[in-house]
Amino acid sequence: EQTGVTNHLYSGWNVVGFWDVHQACARDMLLPLGSTWATAIGYDAGTQDYEVSMINGGTGSYSDQRLMFPGKAYWVSMTAERDLICSYYRTYSFCAEWVGDYHGMQIPITWADEEAEGFYNTLDWSSSWTGQFINGDDAAMERHWKDPAFGGMDSNYIDNTHLAFFTGHGWEGGFVFGTAADDYELNYSEARWGNTKTDWIVLASCNVLNESTCTEYWGPAFEGLHSICGFDTVGAAHPDMGWYFADLLMKGKTIWEAWYTTTDRYVFPNDGSLKSAILAADIDGDLSTPDCLDDHIYGYGSSINPPGDPLGFQYETDSCKWEV
């Protein structure tokens, strides 16, 4: 059985057709080529002119996080021969971390483990998704979420998966761990997510997406990231939140629908006084269109790949109240 397509590319310029049904950034499209690809250039049939180059490791207008589109051909410059392999059957990766025991520095979170493990174990049943790791208490570390530019290792941990889930204490400027490895707190200024792989992050942490600060604080963290789900206000943990959220994702709910439906049901006092939230990348400058706000996880519906530096952000909140 044929499971994929292999194109052998030579040193110099090669023509590559884009095979997928959805757009993808150049970094992801050409990932099998590693460092051997240097430049990719598309042709705009409307203007009958070549587009601005996408450079491996580039930023700004030359960023390798700019999108490549189905039905187009691209010139790809190679520094050495290599095979470009596209599998017909894709699997995606996810991870989870949780902190319940803060060693007296914070109030313990009783159900942190059950919430995160419920999410992890449920999504791991999907044939499209594979769990990479789940860490709890002192094994969950700030360095796993911090960009290497600031001394972290997220490119080996959460940013090496497509979806990352965290349960633990938080505040407007970040979230909190139980061990100082390397710090007790991940500050928003140390996050750069999506520059390796991550598309979606869920932070089951109080106030981390507070309306007054979240775009200013977390906007710079979007380096290919689609969205962050969390809480505008104080939140709450519940043993059924994680599995229920994952189950809704696999039933075809958008990430935002799944998150606010879950928090409506399981965040107490459940009277509408607490609010869940999402911050999502906007790709076209038109905030009346949902863009990444309407993302589904891969394999369960459509999604949109944003550039590394989004034009703007869409922010939504939902009052946590279960209505039968």
Where do the PLM segments sit?
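Extracellular/periplasmic catalytic domains that process cell-envelope and extracellular macromolecules
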Residues: 67-68, 156-159, 193-197, 221-223
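N-terminal exported-region signature
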Residues: 1-88
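A short, glycine/acidic-enriched catalytic loop
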Residues: 170-200, 207
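Solvent-exposed loop/turn segments at secondary-structure junctions
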Residues: 100-105, 138-140, 168-174, 205-212, ...
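Alpha-helical scaffolding within the catalytic cores
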Residues: 148-153, 180-192, 211-219
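A domain-level signal for caspase-like cysteine endopeptidase catalytic cores
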Residues: 89-170
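Active-site-proximal C-terminal subdomain of hydrolase catalytic domains
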Residues: 208-324
